[in-house]
Amino acid sequence: MARSVPLEKVRNIGIAAHIDAGKTTTTERILFYSGVVHKIGEVHDGNAVTDWMEQERERGITITAAAISTSWKDYRVNIIDTPGHVDFTIEVERSMRVLDGVVAVFCSVGGVQPQSETVWRQADRYSVPRIVFVNKMDRTGADFFKVYGQIRDRVRANAVPIQIPIGAESDFQGIVDLVEMKAHIYTNDLGTDILVTDIPAELQETAAEWRSKMVEAVAETDEALLDKYFEDGDLSIEDIKAGLRKGVLIQGNDRLVPMLCGSAFKNKGVQLLLDAVVELLPSPQDIPPIQGTLPDGEVALRPSSDEAPFSALAFKIMADPYGRLTFVRVYSGILQKGSYVYNATKGKKERVSRLIILKADDRIEVDELRAGDLGAVLGLKDTFTGDTLCDDQNPIILESLFIPEPVISVAVEPKTKNDMEKLSKALQALSEEDPTFRVSVDSETNQTVIAGMGELHLEILVDRMLREYKVEANIGAPQVAYRETVRKAVKAEGKFVRQSGGKGQYGHVVIELEPAEPGTGFEFVSKIVGGTVPKEYVGPAEQGMKETCESGVLAGYPLIDIKATLVDGSYHDVDSSEMAFKIAGSMAIKEAVRKADPVLLEPVMKVEVEVPEDFLGSVMGNLISRRGQIEGQATTNGTATVSAKVPLAEMFGYATDLRSMTQGRGIFTMEFSQYEEVPRNVAETIIAKNKGNA
């Protein structure tokens, strides 16, 4: 079966931004103007197409990355609408991994917010080309050029306006297209009647100035264009469009980031945004081939072509009335309904029963997915987020996703004993869908513990248990994910010897333990020479150390950011075994940690609070009382913004306190920043409590 749309006319894009910048509304307008929906949905009415979960419609925030297919002109545009709330960072992360381009939406009033910076960093991690849409130009305090300055300063992007607004706030009438040097004036409320005319006289000088900056930036992307620019002092419209597209695809800090503007809510600027998506953002063919690892450890590339061997990445699992949906991005080859695929990550074959593409709530069955397509597979039982699917004759493992560690946990139990089985089924299904949601059983208390990225994250998952799985649950008080580490380098040994008739046990290792770089977890290196510890016992010794690191010596929290080097040891020809060396490894690491000045670490959050200026003093005082460090403050149009680093342990219940301090007018965002050492007096209390002495 031939392709319905040529690969060069496919665009896989994400719409990403800070909470409340207007992403979902922008997506809704794109669907309206491209003909997928015939009535505009509003987030605040609770009927947006992409917000299809009940909680999303109630809360007016987007939680899961809904994938929708639409068309513009003769292009197919696959859109993923991502959440802006920091508790749902994994949704943004997984969409960035499978996209070719991003529309970053910024509020013209709020500008670059902490979550915008997080999203930008995620796009940087996967080197995703992007364009910027400065939304809400009709709002009081709208300032396109202020946002331009913030994007250049705060996320260090090479931003290039290709439009400027005509008016602002209630006087926002339209847009100047700097490429064509024409004004687009919107003459009706639906944004369908557009008058393309000359630029108003009062804006001509400003437009000429910004066009000149744009042309200069475009010329610098290509030597031939630069020569033309020096000769003629200008570039043709065709040259500008070609140069912009080339500039967007540059890898690294010189990449151009074209800036557009509009008001999705007032239906202004969305068609021009769609034009920019198809003209400037890449097709699957324009991005570098996906890289993976072959079974022999060699690195291989898979070109985005139907003829190449099949490879795809599973980027999301979702429970659905249809069945278990596995969302995939096909990078190469063709995936057919009814075929068998090889899960290279798990080493298992699975059968594809059906293939579907989504238009929000609508499921459309298809016979195949081709290179560059996004779709969902039914029938896969053992495939999870981050797994590679491929042709078993040409196995490959693609680079997986970066999955952040949870920072908060709570104990959970069903309200009635009869619901125990339903609870465990619900927890299993939810943890399959969301890799940042972890479920474990506390070995001492036998309680089920759930962990996630924040209070809202866990609250929504508990809510889903009730709505989707009909399980009522009691939730304990939130617990902070403390960690332990060491502060100095030491040498220690572990010797396990047991001789009591019959076969004995003998394992002996000597290790050096030292602090490692933050974020490295547990690192192990073997420097054994001369066979003092045979190769087959090095792995078990490492395993023993790793398992022991799951429970530290101070308060039983996992040990992180440590490096253990195996330097010496001894063995017995008859009595040595894997188990003996595993125990010796465990003994060595325990001994080393005790000697290496162990300390307690706590998650510290990056907090940004926005409040009316009058409340600034009390809000700052409150943050300081929570062991917060103020990192900066700014005031714009009577609104003060405070940035601080605050331990997560001090942030529980902050939303309620902020509301009462500011008469409900304060808002805040919070995201994980880093682990830091807990002050001694606080650490003593935590350690005593954990040992049952509090």
Curated annotation (Swiss-Prot):
GO terms for biological process: ribosome disassembly. Its main location: cytoplasm. Coiled coil: none annotated. Keywords: Cytoplasm, Elongation factor, GTP-binding, Nucleotide-binding, Protein biosynthesis. One of its GO terms (cellular component) is cytoplasm. It holds the Pfam family GTP_EFTU_D2. Gene3D superfamilies: 3.30.230.10, 3.30.70.240, Elongation Factor G (Translational Gtpase), domain 3 (3.30.70.870), P-loop containing nucleotide triphosphate hydrolases (3.40.50.300), Translation factors (2.40.30.10). One of its GO terms (molecular function) is translation elongation factor activity. SMART domains: EFG_C, EFG_IV. Residues 8-285 form the tr-type G domain. It is found in: Cytoplasm. GTP binds at residues 17-24, 81-85, 135-138. Belongs to the TRAFAC class translation factor GTPase superfamily. Classic translation factor GTPase family. EF-G/EF-2 subfamily. Catalyzes the GTP-dependent ribosomal translocation step during translation elongation. During this step, the ribosome changes from the pre-translocational (PRE) to the post-translocational (POST) state as the newly formed A-site-bound peptidyl-tRNA and P-site-bound deacylated tRNA move to the P and E sites, respectively. Catalyzes the coordinated movement of the two tRNA molecules, the mRNA and conformational changes in the ribosome. This is Elongation factor G. It comes from Synechococcus elongatus (strain ATCC 33912 / PCC 7942 / FACHB-805).
